[in-house]
Curated annotation (Swiss-Prot):
Consequence of gene loss (knockout): Double deletion mutant FtsEX grows well on plates with LB medium with 1% NaCl forming healthy colonies at 30 degrees Celsius, whereas at 37 or 42 degrees Celsius, the colonies are very tiny and sick. In culture medium it exhibits mild elongation of cells at 30 degrees Celsius, and become very extensive at higher temperatures. This double mutant does not grow on LB culture medium without NaCl (LBON) at any temperature, possibly due to excessive lethal filamentation.
Region (Disordered) residue spans: 19-48
Chief place where the protein resides: membrane
Name of the protein described by the UniProt record: Cell division protein FtsX
One Pfam family of this chain: FtsX
Stated family: Belongs to the ABC-4 integral membrane protein family. FtsX subfamily.
GO cellular component, as recorded: ATPase complex; cell division site; division septum; divisome complex; Gram-negative-bacterium-type cell wall; membrane; plasma membrane; plasma membrane protein complex
Membrane topology: Multi-pass membrane protein
InterPro entries: ABC3_permease_C, FtsX, FtsX_ECD, FtsX_proteobact
One BP term from GO: division septum assembly
Described purpose of this protein according to its UniProt entry: Part of the ABC transporter FtsEX involved in cellular division. Important for assembly or stability of the septal ring. Encoded in an operon consisting of genes ftsY, ftsE and ftsX.
Keywords, alphabetical: Cell cycle, Cell division, Cell inner membrane, Cell membrane, Membrane, Transmembrane, Transmembrane helix
Length: 352
């Protein structure tokens, strides 16, 4: 930096410093020519608050000016952040809607219990009572041998063949519906093992094949969403950190002047922190807009597919709480990335 550039930077910073002093302490002459006022008790707390507010305003204004000075580069950075955040947001919405569809359209898993044919009605009622008393059982639907035969006759259409039989070949059936807390794979297996030990039970079958497939599918979608989210958060962190680093190098002459006249690291650091937070917030806001556009475009297609299957399903986007959380998290990521990039530069910076 030559002598003329240094003088220009000092003049610019001196003008900003004068405006800062005027806004905080009144006129620029330190109050020497101001009319005398009645003495009053000092208010150091209010003065400190005014100084802090003015520093925040100055730093925020500097961050905005820095972003506005290079609009194309800022736009590209925000677009990269938005696209990086849109992918995990869409994956999360897919995971959330798959869970909603599973809850809405799939029944709870059931355990079918076949009783021994030698049991009479009283013994069968005792077995059903034991099933109902088991931990984790919500409800037991009992079907006697006669009811099972009548239902099979109506369903199969082999009424004539069944009439030729001398005795009823079907056993009594008890359908056990577990509680919501016992609908996991391990809990169902434990409940099935306990039911098998009850006297009077011939066979136990667990109708959870579809449930296991659905749980595996939703778990896979959730893990993929989490992995993509972690990678995209790292990408956003690197993008914001690199953008702030380039901004620091572009303003190294101004930082040099500020260091020479005694500016603290916190004063130099604050505009870059606000700039990183603004980049994260803007990218997250644009990501929410892109995600909502994608939901609106896919809603009609999903509705048509659901209509073909004779049902109705609506895609749910991100809720207000989820949108607010995304904005806050991305702003914090931008803040931390800018802090790391700026601190690393100031640590090795030597005024010239």
């Amino acid at each position: 930096m030559n002598k003329r550039d240094a003088i220009n930077h000092i003049r610019q910073f001196g003008g900003r410093l004068d405006r800062f002093r005027k806004s905080v302490g009144g006129s620029g002459d330190g109050g020497r020519n101001a009319p005398k006022r009645a003495k009053s008790s000092p208010k150091p707390v209010n003065r400190k608050t005014n100084v802090f507010n003015e520093q925040v305003r100055y730093a925020f204004h500097g961050a905005l000016q820095d972003l506005k000075s290079k609009p194309f580069a800022t736009f590209l950075t925000v677009m990269v952040i938005a696209i990086s955040l849109t992918l995990p947001s869409v994956c999360y919405m897919v995971y959330k809607n798959v869970n909603q569809a599973a809850t809405q359209y799939y029944p709870s898993p059931q355990i079918t219990v076949y009783l021994q044919k030698t049991l009479d009605d009283d013994a069968a009622a005792g077995v059903v009572a034991q099933l109902q008393a088991e931990q984790g059982v919500e409800k037991v639907n009992y079907l006697s041998r006669e009811d099972a035969l009548g239902e099979f006759r109506n369903w199969s259409g082999f009424g004539g063949a069944l009439d030729m039989l001398e005795e009823n070949p079907l056993p009594a059936v008890a359908v056990v519906i577990p509680k919501l807390d016992f609908q996991g794979t391990e809990s169902l297996n434990t409940l099935r093992d306990r039911i098998t030990q009850i006297n009077g039970i011939d066979e136990v079958r667990m109708d959870d094949s579809w449930f296991a497939r659905l749980a595996a599918l939703t778990g896979l979608v959730g893990r993929v969403s989490a992995m993509i989210g972690v990678l995209m958060v790292a990408a956003v962190f690197l993008v914001i950190g690199n953008s702030v680093r380039l901004s620091i190098f572009a303003r190294r002459d101004s930082i040099n002047v500020q260091k020479l006249i005694g500016a603290t690291d916190g004063f130099i650091l604050r505009p870059f922190l606000y700039g990183g937070a603004l980049l994260g917030f803007s990218g997250a806001l644009l990501s929410l807009i892109l995600s909502e556009i994608l939901v609106l475009r896919l809603s009609s297609a999903v509705a048509e597919v659901a209509q073909v299957f004779g049902t109705k399903f609506d895609i749910n986007g991100l809720s207000f709480d989820e949108c607010l959380l995304l904005l806050l998290v991305c702003s914090m990521i931008g803040w931390v990335a800018a802090w790391l990039a700026t601190v690393q530069h100031l640590r090795h910076f030597t005024p010239e």
